[in-house]
A protein has these predicted regions:
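Short beta-to-alpha transition helix within the HATPase_c
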Residues: 3-41, 91-93
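Conserved short strand/loop->alpha-helix "switch" segment adjacent to the catalytic nucleotide/phosphoryl-transfer site
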Residues: 41-87, 119
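Conserved transmitter core of two-component histidine kinases
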Residues: 44-52, 105-108, 142-143
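Short beta-strand/loop element within the Bergerat-fold HATPase_c
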Residues: 85-100, 108
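Glycine-rich nucleotide-binding loop
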Residues: 113, 145-152
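ATP phosphate-binding glycine-rich loop and adjacent ATP-lid/helix-beta elements
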Residues: 113-141, 169-170
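C-terminal end segment of the histidine kinase catalytic
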Residues: 153-170
Length: 170
């Protein structure tokens, strides 16, 4: 329990450091790199990130940072990042509708041990199912496919992220 709690606090601290300047936003890609960086071997094959620059408000960055932290932790303990040759691929896009912009992303694990449906719902699953919808109106779906966990998530982007400049040092 202590280790999990410490990891969650570290994740929050990392995200807050990214947001130290209130007039700037942090990119979704940087939040991903912040959480997944320890597993990136530099080959561009173990961790694959693909998508446009998407600035996030502090609320979105903190909430998504926690979700990505939980996905990363589970991948490292039980999934594709727990074995040599395992891979995490995150693809994202922004769609522009009549009244809002929506960020959609897919987290896809492959090359890990066979996946089975968990016996109980862990913190990460509860975060995706209940916390993110309440905090940032996100909708997510988790598929425990035998060849790797897949997560699809969609969330509205606030209008203010359109005009906020991202930190130049990220």
């Amino acid at each position: 329990f202590k280790t999990a709690l410490f990891g969650r606090i570290q994740s929050l601290a990392k995200t807050h450091l990214l947001l130290s300047d209130e007039e700037r936003a942090v990119s979704f890609a940087h939040v991903l790199r912040s959480e997944l960086g320890a597993f990136d071997d530099g080959s561009h094959e173990r961790i694959v990130l693909s998508g446009p620059d998407v600035p996030l408000t502090s609320q979105l960055a903190v909430s998504l940072g926690m979700a990505i932290h939980e996905l990363t932790t589970n991948a490292a303990k039980y999934g594709s990042l727990s074995v040599y040759g395992g891979k995490v691929e995150v693809n994202w896009s922004v769609t522009i509708g009549a009244t809002r912009r929506t960020l959609s992303f897919d987290w896809v694990e492959s090359g890990g041990p066979p996946v089975t449906q968990p016996q109980r719902q862990g913190f990460g699953s509860r975060l995706l199912a209940y916390v993110l919808p309440g905090q940032i109106q996100a909708r997510s779906r988790i598929d425990f496919a035998s060849n790797g966990v897949r997560v699809h998530c969609e969330l509205p982007l606030p209008a203010e992220t359109h005009d906020v400049k991202m930190r130049a040092d990220l």
